Amino acid sequence: MVSLRLPLILLSLLAISFSCSAAPPPVYDTEGHELSADGSYYVLPASPGHGGGLTMAPRVLPCPLLVAQETDERRKGFPVRFTPWGGAAAPEDRTIRVSTDVRIRFNAATICVQSTEWHVGDEPLTGARRVVTGPLIGPSPSGRENAFRVEKYGGGYKLVSCRDSCQDLGVSRDGARAWLGASQPPHVVVFKKARPSPPE
């Protein structure tokens, strides 16, 4: 009886060890804490002198709003929230992990009175793939317009859109604005925890 239990115990320990080591590493904020689906974070450039945080701005029409970068590096933009995409993680695991599909939304209200969840769409004027907030218009066959990943990159992280195939998200200038979309080089970022506003 004892001789049968030992291999079973060893096999169980091996399975637990394998499942623990198989999880991708967590994404960390600027204070060294793991990103959580319960938290809000500013998405800021990893290096100073490269503009401010991510915000929402109109492109041609007042709505929908596109994801843009603040030109003034003192402006942090709006905080975002990450949630696992399509049940990618166990419900009890609230940690945001590298190379794992997530949904991203701004934790802010807009004049458009619609969702602030991100998705990638083709801009009608230029055909460029931009990150847009709000409802999906003309979803692709894959249904993954709102699937993103955070990948370790250089001294920070990069955001990746995994709509059809995974593409880096970069910032491209168009007039006075810098827009987030599928472009090179990738926009290298860090995540700063947003603190709740003190009561007035």
Curated annotation (Swiss-Prot):
InterPro entries: Kunitz_inhibitor_STI-like_sf, Prot_inh_Kunz-lg. The keyword Disulfide bond applies. Coiled coil: none annotated. GO terms for molecular function: alpha-amylase inhibitor activity; serine-type endopeptidase inhibitor activity. Pfam families: Kunitz_legume (PF00197). Gene3D superfamilies: 2.80.10.50. Residues 1-22 form the signal peptide. Disulfide bonds join 63-112, 162-166. The record marks 88-89 as: Reactive bond. The keyword Signal applies. Keywords: Alpha-amylase inhibitor, Disulfide bond, Protease inhibitor, Serine protease inhibitor, Signal. This protein inhibits independently subtilisin and T.castaneum alpha-amylase but not barley alpha-amylase. PANTHER family: KUNITZ TRYPSIN INHIBITOR 2, KUNITZ TRYPSIN INHIBITOR 5. Belongs to the protease inhibitor I3 (leguminous Kunitz-type inhibitor) family. This is Alpha-amylase/subtilisin inhibitor. It comes from Oryza sativa subsp. japonica (Rice). The gene is RASI.
